[in-house]
Curated annotation (Swiss-Prot):
Belongs to the eukaryotic ribosomal protein eL24 family. It comes from the Eukaryota. InterPro entries: L24e/L24_sf, Ribosomal_eL24, Ribosomal_eL24-rel_N, Ribosomal_eL24_CS, TRASH_dom. Transmembrane segments: none annotated. One of its GO terms (molecular function) is mRNA binding. The lineage of its organism: Eukaryota, Viridiplantae, Streptophyta, Embryophyta, Tracheophyta. GO terms for biological process: cytoplasmic translation. CDD domains: Ribosomal_L24e_L24. Pfam families: Ribosomal_L24e. PANTHER family: 60S RIBOSOMAL PROTEIN L24, RIBOSOMAL PROTEIN L24, PUTATIVE-RELATED. It comes from Prunus avium. Keywords: Ribonucleoprotein, Ribosomal protein. This is Large ribosomal subunit protein eL24. Coiled coil: none annotated.
Length: 186
């Protein structure tokens, strides 16, 4: 039969079922103490790291070295196990490991070159589209004045700003949008 033991929140000692003192703080955090001595020291706000008989002190001052060394030995005896990564099998990984660095560098450079060419191609396409759009706007806009072109530029102020453009039109700014309105009053 296995007994579920808990640890004292102050001293770090084992507490067996039916033993210990349970303290529940107002923020509903539960503390379990081994005895009234641990409870009293906790409430008096003594630091367990300064009391020589607590587990925290022993750990900080390396008193239980023999037990920790055994645990460390157990941890380090794990055998390395090579697993395949998602998207690549073990054979592919082994093949890549064994291939020469020159071949690997050449493949990397080729991949980088391809990516750069693709980026350059997309930039050129965007420039061509932009040029077409500006040409079409210029050809359409020769007869009429563009919306934003007729307004004189003044100092940029926050909030609402009224500005007279001509004898019968007024523009007001809200943020960065300019809205034209013809006025009834002059």
């Amino acid at each position: 039969m296995v007994l579920k033991t808990e640890l004292c929140r102050f001293s770090g000692a084992k507490i067996y079922p039916g033993k210990g003192i349970r303290f529940i703080r107002s923020d509903s955090q539960v503390f379990l103490f081994a005895n009234s001595k641990c409870k009293r020291y906790f409430h008096n706000r003594l630091k367990p790291s300064k009391l020589t008989w607590t587990a925290m002190y022993r750990k900080q001052h390396k008193k239980d070295i023999a037990q920790e060394a055994v645990k460390k030995r157990r941890r380090t005896t794990k055998k390395p196990y090579s697993r395949s990564i998602v998207g690549a099998t073990l054979e592919v990984i082994q093949k890549r490991r064994t291939e020469k660095p020159e071949v690997r560098d050449a493949a990397r450079e080729a991949a980088l070159r391809e990516i750069k060419e693709r980026i350059k191609k997309t930039k050129d396409e965007k420039k061509a589209k932009k040029a077409e759009v500006t040409k079409s706007q210029k050809s359409q806009g020769k007869g009429s004045i563009a919306k934003g072109g007729a307004q004189p530029k003044g100092p940029k102020l926050g909030g609402w700003r009224w500005q007279a453009l001509s004898h019968c039109s007024v523009a007001y700014l809200l943020g960065s949008r300019v809205i034209d309105r013809t006025c009834l009053f002059v």
